Amino acid sequence: MRKGFTLLELLTVVMIISILAIIAIPQFFRVAERARASEAVNVLGIIRSAQLRYYAEHSATYATSLADLDVDVPPNNDDYKYFNAPNVGIAGQASMTRKNAGASIGNYTLTINYDTGDINCTGGAAGTCRRLGF
């Protein structure tokens, strides 16, 4: 009696593993990029809360600089791994742009509206914002 696997059995296992990898790898990259985007989403949420406090205390105007806000958000690009430093100088909005993304993702921008809290995504490679759920 022979012990071991036949060539057909080994090829079947290799095919099944290949099919699973083909399905799983794109999902992995999407989930990984979504996790990277959470860096910006968290910072933008903190800025929005600070801007709403500033708005209530300063005659219905928003701050135009991070230094004017009562938050501990780093102001320099080097302080962030995946995004550039936030821009709060936009009327009623703050934004952060992805840096050093590959060609398949592109450098997209996430923008939060202070009034509604909605986060919008623009730019990047075709379909990036849709794949990330924005």
Kindly give the residue locations of the regions a language model identified.
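Generic low-complexity, intrinsically disordered sequence content enriched
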Residues: 11-15, 48, 73
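Generic N-terminal initiation segments characterized by hydrophobic and/or small/turn-forming residues
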Residues: 4-8, 41, 63-66, 107
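Conserved hydrophobic/amphipathic alpha-helical signal-anchor segments
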Residues: 22, 30-69
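N-terminal single-pass transmembrane signal-anchor helix
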Residues: 1-32
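Periplasmic/extracellular, small/polar-rich flexible segments of pilin-like filament-forming proteins
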Residues: 52-134
